[in-house]
Each structure stands twice: as structure tokens, then as C-alpha cells.
Amino acid sequence: MRPAHLNTVLDEEFLGAQNGSHTPVMLWGAPGVGKSQIIAQIGDRHDIPVIDIRLSQMEPSDLRGIPFRDHDKVEWAIPAMLPNAERHGNKGILFLDEITSAVPSVSAAAYQLILDRKLGEYEVPNGWAIFAAGNRQGDRGVTYAMPSPLANRFSHYDVDIHLDDWVAWAYQNNIHESIIAFLRFRPELLFDFDPAHNPVAFPSPRSWEFTNRALQKFSDKPVLLLGTLQACVGPSAGIELKAFIDSLDQMPDLDAIIRGEDIKAPKEIDLQYAVASALVGRAIRAKNDDNAEEIFGHILSYAKAFRQKEMGVMLVSDLLRAVGDDLFNVPAFSQWAESIGDILLYD
């Protein structure tokens, strides 16, 4: 399932924890596809704590607690990391990450916690959702087969790679427009992992975020830039990205486009992607300006300049995701919509 749809599912499952209809959710996916980040987004959106427990680093006693003698009986000291309404609040997410990397004895300790929301005398507070994530056995990580009793305690979702969802996230998180444009140009490089070769650096949603950091730190150090890009996404993708960035000095004048001047779209496909991504970035930065509607209108007008109408559709679709439904109120939007004829704006 694509990340945008998973966000909706997880939102509903979190809300279900408030009314007793919650089902624990297990997210499956290769390394770096964004499983943990999807959970973090749910926490941010609802302004709730996310307790992230890495089960691969646990022993059974870490979950069950430590016994201690109390006069003529034995009590259990409940681990402080587990959700507690007084310490952590009445609502939140208990996230069991790397669950498929946990040794079987730890998985067994988690059975009751996940299904019954109990572990010995401990109870997960009402209002807390339980989510988990892990890699698949074919991903060359340290993984164990999930026991059937544990698997049957979850609803299961595979995390798909979806470029449009990643692009929407990238604009919201200030990923450099050149990286967004490059992945629009080479979408197959958003995720390129071959378990058979087990590379140490490879393209993934997570490693492209690292690449953005490298670009910010080393763009003014050309001797180091290529090596740092390759260190994040691997030798081949790093070389391609560096060549793409080097070609951006041939881009048309973006300021002139924003001013509404008649500027031709570049003929080169890679530059077209670069221009489209850069204009969406400009629109985001101008969203709260007094002349935002005018800027949006000039970008919409420029969307008609592309020889391939699909390129204009992509630009306006990304623009809509970035600035919201206010775009429909810009007079130039209806003019652009009429110009694309039988091509529909895609979601």
C-alpha cells in the first residue's frame, strides 16, 4: 500500500484506540522505505508521544520487567519505557520496531502485549495504539520468520514505494528541488536495492534524505561533492545525480517566469523536470506572500509552455499538493485546465 493511503489507515487505527476498535498494525518493507517515518508522521499529526522500542535490542526480561521480593511475595518492576498514562499521557503510539529482527524469546514475550494489551500485571493504557514494523526475510537483514501466533495478532501491510507520495513529503521537508527533479527524471532510482548483491549504499527514500544533507553541506566543495553523494546512494546513482546537477546552469530564468515574462520551456527533458520542481519550490516559499496568487498564476501560465502536456500536468499536480486547494481559485487555473484537453489532473 502506498504511504499516503497507509497514513489514512494508521490515522483510523490510532483513533480506534480511543474507542476500543483498534487493531495492531504490522508494516513490512525493505530497508530505507520509510516505515519508521510513517509512524513518526502519525505522532506529529496528532501531537502525541511515540514510544519507539527496538525489539532487536531487547531480552525477554526487558519487556517483562525484573522480579523483586516484597515480604512474602514476588512483585515485578515494570519497565519505565512502556507507556504509562501518568508519565506519557492518555494517548500515544507504542511502536515495536525491528520486530522481525527480535530473537524468538523476545517475540514470545510480545504476544500478550500485542493482542491482550497486557504483559503480566502491566496493561497498555486505553488510548494507546500498537504499531510494529520490520524487514522481510529476503531483504538480507538480520530477520527471523514471524511465528504464526504473533503474525495472527496483527493486520499486515506492505509499504510500497510511490514517487508522488515521496515528492509531496520532500517538498514539505525542504528536500532540495534538484533531487526532486532528478527523481522525477529517473523515478526508478527512488528505490534500487538488490538483496543478491547486498550493497552498503543504495538509493532509498531514507538515503535520498541523507543525500539532501550532503548536498547542503558540500555543494560549495566540488572536489568532495561527488564522493559524498555516492556515499549516500551508491556509485552509479551518485554519478548520475552529480551530472544532473551540473546541467542545471542551463535552466531558464526562474525569476522571469515568476514575473510572468514569456519564457520558453527547455527542450531537454531533464531540464524540464528541473524547472518544474524549482517552480513548485518557489510557490511553496511564496505561499504566505501578498502576491502569492499572482505567482501561482504565472506558474500555471508557464505550465502551458511545455511541448509535452504531461509535463505541465505533473507540474500543476505537484503544485496542488504543495499549496493546497487555494490553487483552484486562481483564475489561471481554469485557463490551464482548458488547455490540457483530454489529459486529466492525476492524484
What role is predicted for each listed range?
Residues H298-D347:
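Long, positively charged, glycine-interspersed low-complexity recognition regions
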Residues S36, S236, Y346-D347:
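Compositionally biased, intrinsically disordered low-complexity segments
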Residues D11, D44-D47, D52, D62, ...:
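Acidic-enriched, low-complexity/disordered segments with a strong bias for Aspartate over Glutamate
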Residues Q172-S317:
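Alpha-helical lid/collar subdomain of P-loop NTPases
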Residues Y144, S204, V323-D326:
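Alpha-helical interaction segments
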Residues L27, E75, S207, L327, ...:
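Residues in intrinsically disordered, low-complexity segments of regulatory proteins
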